[in-house]
Curated annotation (Swiss-Prot):
Record's protein name: ER protein translocation subcomplex subunit sec67
An individual GO BP term: protein transport
InterPro entries in the cross-refs: TPR-like_helical_dom_sf (IPR011990), TPR_rpt (IPR019734)
Database matches in PANTHER family: TETRATRICOPEPTIDE REPEAT PROTEIN 4, TRANSLOCATION PROTEIN SEC72
GO cellular component terms listed in the entry, alphabetical order: cytosol; nucleus; Sec62/Sec63 complex
Protein keywords: Cytoplasm, Nucleus, Protein transport, Transport
Species for this entry: Schizosaccharomyces pombe (strain 972 / ATCC 24843) (Fission yeast)
Length: 192
């Protein structure tokens, strides 16, 4: 659908009562105003572009790769799951810059968080911590990431840091993603 262009009417200045320099200046102003009226975009400023639509084919590929990785994780094929989450992350990060960045952030944070889960299952705790940290930098209200970060810290015997991560998660995480954090906090308070 082509946008309808409205015609711009150049204002007219009555210069019949002017003399000398005023007359010359008035004519120049009139000529300039008329010339602007002929431009498609006055002052050479085009209208804003419509919002970009996300590449749905890429979203489909990312989701299929994530589902395949989730299935591998359920079958306890953690190395395969880690690799597939990494590939899905690469796909998500290959979005064009004009696409909505919120979609890239959402997909990337989920892939990093899921890869952290696979790394925890593989006892690759520093890698899991790095992925959880990266996911939280992208999306700081993602409760599962706080949980995974705390579990990685706990596995590395950094209990006080893990407790602080759980506290932070309980404050910052979305309510729907807090359940695991509540259970983890309960387990920490029972030990004390």
């Amino acid at each position: 659908m082509v946008a309808k262009q409205e015609s711009v009417v150049a204002p007219q200045v009555d210069v019949s009562k002017w003399s000398g320099k005023e007359l010359e200046l008035g004519k120049k102003v009139n000529e300039y105003a008329k010339s602007l009226a002929t431009f498609k975009y006055p002052f050479f400023i085009p209208p804003p572009y419509p919002p970009a639509k996300p590449n749905m084919a890429l979203s489909t590929q990312v989701n299929k790769m994530k589902q395949t990785a989730n299935e591998a994780f359920k079958r306890k094929k953690y190395e395969e799951a880690k690799k597939l989450y990494g590939l899905a992350l690469q796909l998500a990060l290959n979005r064009c810059t004009w696409e909505p960045s919120i979609l890239t952030r959402e997909e990337a944070s989920v892939m990093l968080c899921n890869r952290a889960a696979a790394e925890i299952a593989l006892s690759q705790f520093p890698e899991a911590l790095a992925d959880a940290n990266a996911a939280l930098k992208i999306r700081n209200n993602y409760g599962k990431c706080y949980y995974r970060k705390a579990k990685a810290l706990e596995a590395m015997h950094r209990i006080e840091e893990a407790k602080q991560v759980v506290r932070d998660g309980l404050i910052l995480a979305e309510p729907v993603t807090r359940n695991e954090l509540v259970a983890l906090w309960a387990s920490y308070t029972e030990k004390d």
